[in-house]
């Protein structure tokens, strides 16, 4: 069975911006491996969940662990995408407005350099940032890009026909 993760895509529709200026909050992984990687390295906050755990509950937990923010409000299902690794990621979107300066990530231990036998404690996430939808497509992992399409389509359907 492929690994499973659940995640949340926080979005906002800032007032005073041109209509259609949807923004999404993405995270950049911490640690030396990711330090010089930017475009194509960002992701939605997500993490693995156990067989007996509800995916949405796991997504909320992972979001808080990786950002320090509390996810609340209506959660819009975005379905699942499969990453290149084979991992299945199930995601929801919610409207929020977290300040990237307030991001606080959990930490984890890695072996660094690889196969060195040395351990290094790193933040799981070293940065969070708001992106316009077009810019997000450049920075987000390509195997999660479909989640942006689904969010845009979901919000378009909810807003009804243009007048």
Specify the residue positions occupied by each region the protein language model found:
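Short, charged, solvent-exposed linker or helix-capping segments at domain edges/interfaces
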Residues: 19-20, 101-107, 140-142
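N-terminal strand-loop-strand
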Residues: 1-44, 92
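Non-DNA-binding regulatory cores of transcription-related proteins
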Residues: 120-126
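Charged phosphate-binding loop/patch that engages nucleotide di/tri-phosphates or the phosphate backbone
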Residues: 129, 133-163
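Short, charged/polar surface micro-motifs in flexible loops or helix N-caps
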Residues: 14-16, 31-34, 50-51, 85-86, ...
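Active-site-adjacent beta-strand/loop module that shapes the phosphate/pyrophosphate-binding cleft
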Residues: 80-117, 129, 151, 155
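The catalytic Nudix box helix
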Residues: 44-78, 132
């Amino acid at each position: 069975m492929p690994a499973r993760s659940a995640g949340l895509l926080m979005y906002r529709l800032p007032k005073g911006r041109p209509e259609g200026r949807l923004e999404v909050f993405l995270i950049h992984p911490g640690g030396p491996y990711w330090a010089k990687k930017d475009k194509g390295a960002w992701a939605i906050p997500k993490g693995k969940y156990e067989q007996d755990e509800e995916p949405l509950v796991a997504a909320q937990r992972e979001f808080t662990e990786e950002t320090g923010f509390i996810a609340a409000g209506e959660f819009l299902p975005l379905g699942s995408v499969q990453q290149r690794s084979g991992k299945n990621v199930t995601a929801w979107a919610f409207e929020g407005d977290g300040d990237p300066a307030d991001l606080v990530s959990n930490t984890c231990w890695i072996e660094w350099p690889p196969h060195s036998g040395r351990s290094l404690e790193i933040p799981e996430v070293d940065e969070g940032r708001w992106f316009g939808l077009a810019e997000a497509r450049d920075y987000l992992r390509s195997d999660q890009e479909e989640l942006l399409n689904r969010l845009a389509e979901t919000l378009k359907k909810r807003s009804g026909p243009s007048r």
